[in-house]
Amino acid sequence: MTLVRLARQEDFDSVAALLVELGRPAVTDRETCLAVYTRDMEDPEAAHLLAEDDEGRVVGFCSLHFRPRLNQVSPQAYVPDLIVTEAARSKKVGHALLSEAENRARRRGCHHLTLESAHWRKDAHRFYLGFGLTDDGLAFGKALV
């Protein structure tokens, strides 16, 4: 059984390890990375969810941000990070995290839940479609630094 709870400041090392496992580009020094994590944890327009297995090991993380949209009265829920350890994939961890994110977004009055996924992450795409998300289009980006 997966326990989903709010992430805390002391979960930093576990969350950082998940980001590394996913291959996310990250700040290289721990002090700066911790400062970024702390800033994000203190954001009132965000929620950060952690998944633990039966033995209390961290097996997943989901960040959820509430963003205003000019064409909507209600905010949009955006998931910039949904990470499940490779060993815990296909064990309903991602489903538990995304379900909690959806529940929080609904309680917040959000009109839409969205996330982005790299085009090559085909297994993740199947999971998202199976969860009920739709392919709403493409995301474009440009590195600025």
PLM regions: where:
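Extreme N-terminal starter segment of soluble prokaryotic enzymes
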Residues: 1-4
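Acetyl-CoA-dependent GNAT
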Residues: 6-13, 17-74, 80, 98-99, ...
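Short acidic/polar active-site loop segments enriched in Thr and Asp
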Residues: 47, 111, 134
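Residue-level recognition of the GNAT/N-acetyltransferase active site
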Residues: 67, 85, 118
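Conserved acetyl-CoA-binding loop-helix of GNAT-fold acetyltransferases
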Residues: 84, 90-103, 130
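Conserved active-site alpha-helix within GNAT-family acetyltransferase domains
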Residues: 95, 107, 119-138, 142
